[in-house]
Amino acid sequence: MVKMMEKKNYCKEIQDYIDYASNNPNKISEDIKLCIENIVKPTLSRDDIIFDEKVFQDCIKFCEKWFYPLFPYQKFIYAFFFMYEKETPSLVIFSEILILMGRGNGKDGMLMPLCCFLLTHYYGIKNYNIDIVATSEEQAINTFNVVYNMLDENKTVMKKYFEWNKTEIRNKKTNSKLRYNTSNAKTKDGKQTGMILFNEYHAYEDYKQINVYSSGLGKIEHARTVIITTNGTVREGPLDEKISISESVLRGEDNFLNLLPFLYRLKKREDVDKAFAKFLETKDKKDINLDILCQANPSLEYREVLKNEIIKDYLKMQQQKSYRTEFYAKRVNLPEQDEDEVAIEWNKILKASFKNVEEKIPRDFNVKDGEDAIVGIDFADLNDFASVGLLFKIENEIIWRHHTWICCKSRFYKDIKFPFANIGLDGFNDFEVVNTESINARDIVLYVLKYIGKYNIKKIVLDSYRYKLLEQTFKEFNVSVETRDNPNGLIRMVRYPASIAAIVAPQLEVEFSNGNINIGDSALMRWSINNTGVKTGRDGNKAYYKIEPKLRKNDPFMAFVVAMSVINLLVKEVIYV
C-alpha cells in the first residue's frame, strides 16, 4: 500500500537537479531542459498524483548503503518511479521511462540498485518480477551481476532476505524475482512481469522480441517498461521510433503513452569539436573543456575515468577516421554512419523527408496535375520486393514518391529488418504487403498506367531484365519501348545498370547536401537509402551496393536512381523573346 506524504508535489532531489540545470545550462541537453519545463514541472503541479516520498527516501538510503553513492541526476530520475495515480495507486504516472546516455556513464550501475530495492518489502509489491532483456547474453549477465555481486559480497546479511543463483534472484518476503533474458524470445511469452528493463535498445532492428516480453505486463500493479541505452547505427528501428515519439512529448504534445524520456545527447557534431578546439592548437590537455559533453554524459563531472576515456576516444578518432561512427553514436548519442560505406549520410536523408527535422514536419508535395514526370521501376525478384516511383523537378527541388510491394511469402520476409506492422501509420503509407506467392507484374504496370493520364510521363525507366518480366502487360496496354527507330517510345531500357551509379551518384551527393531532394515522410524510403552503400572503383567511378544483401532491401532507392538517370528530360526549356 502506498503511504502518502503531505507534500505530494515537492521533492528535494528533483528541485536540486532543476536548480543545477538552471545554473549550468551548458551542461544540460536541450532535451533535458524541455523535459523539465514540459513534463517535470507540470507533473509536480498536478493534484491528481501521489508522490511516495517516504519510500523514495528509503530507496535512496538502501541503494547508497548496499551499493554506492548516487549522483544528483540519478536521484532525480529515481524520484519518478514513486509517482502514482491518486484515484488508482496501482497505476504509475510514467509507465514507460526512456534513458538515453553515452557509453561509460554507468547505466547498469544506476538502475540495478533501484531494481534490487523494488524487489524488497520496503517497496511492498508482492511478486513484482523484473525482467532484464538484452540482445546478447553477455550484456544481460553483466547487468544482472550488479545485484548478484552485491548480494554475494554481503551474503551474511543478505541471505536472510534473498536467495540467489546465477540466473535468478528472489526476495524471500515478497517473492519478487530479478531475472535476465536474451534473444530467444519464443519461450518467454506469458511471463507475469512487474517491470521490464530493456538494455541497449539500439541493438533491436524490429519489435519481434520486444513485443514478446511486453505482453507479460499488466498482471502486476505498478507495471512499467524501462529502456536504458546508448544510440547505435541501426536506423528506422525501434529506438529511432521511440526517440521520435519522445521528441513530440518533449515539445509538449499529448503524452498518451505516459512516457518519460531522459535524452542525454548532443545535437550538433561541432559541439564535440568545441570542447577540444583550444587543445588542438596548444596540445595541452588543460585546455580541454568537456562541459558541453556533459549533455550526453551526465556522469562526466563525477567520474575521472570516463573523462579520460572520452579524451582518448576523441584523439583516436582524429587518427582513425573509421572510428568516427562509433564515437559519435556511443559517446555523445549523435548517430553518424561510416562515410566510406553509406551512399547518403543519415542527417541528409532526414532533411529529404522533413522540412523541420526536429519537429518531424514532412516536406510538401507541391506537384500539379499535368506536371512532367519520370517513372522509375526496380525489383530483384517478384517474390520479394518491387518498387515504382514518380520523379518530378519543380525549380530546384527534386521530388520523389514511390509505392512498394512486399511479398510476405518470401523466405526472407520474417527476418527483414523493417517494421512492416506499422503499415498505415504516418510515414508508413507507401507500401503494401501481398499474401501471394509473388508480386503480380500486372499490378506494377497498372500502377504506372494510372499516372499516365494524371501527369505528363516523359519516360518509364527500368533495366532490360526487369522489363522482360513486365513486357507482356506493357504490350497489352500499347506502351511502346524507346528504340533507334522509335525514339519517342515511353519505356527506356537500361542495358548496363551498373553504369548508372557512375553518373547518378555524384549528382545525388550534391543534391542531398544542398537539401534539394524531397522524398516526403517515407520510413521505407529512408530505410532503403540507408541500406545502400557506395564504393569508388580504381577508375574513380562510384557503384551502389546493398550493405546487407538479403535482409536490408534497397529497391525503392534503386528505382529512384534509375529515374534520376534521365532527369535531364525534366529540365524545362526557357525561350527568351
Locate the predicted segments by residue.
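Phosphate/NTP-binding elements of NTP-utilizing enzymes
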Residues: 2-377, 531
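Active-site phosphate-binding and catalytic loops of NTP-dependent enzymes
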Residues: 154-158, 515, 571, 575
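RNase H-like, metal-dependent nuclease domains and their acidic two-metal-ion catalytic environment used
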Residues: 112, 141, 149-150, 170-174, ...
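Short polybasic/polar patches that bind polyanions
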Residues: 64, 475, 513
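Extracytoplasmic
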Residues: 508-517
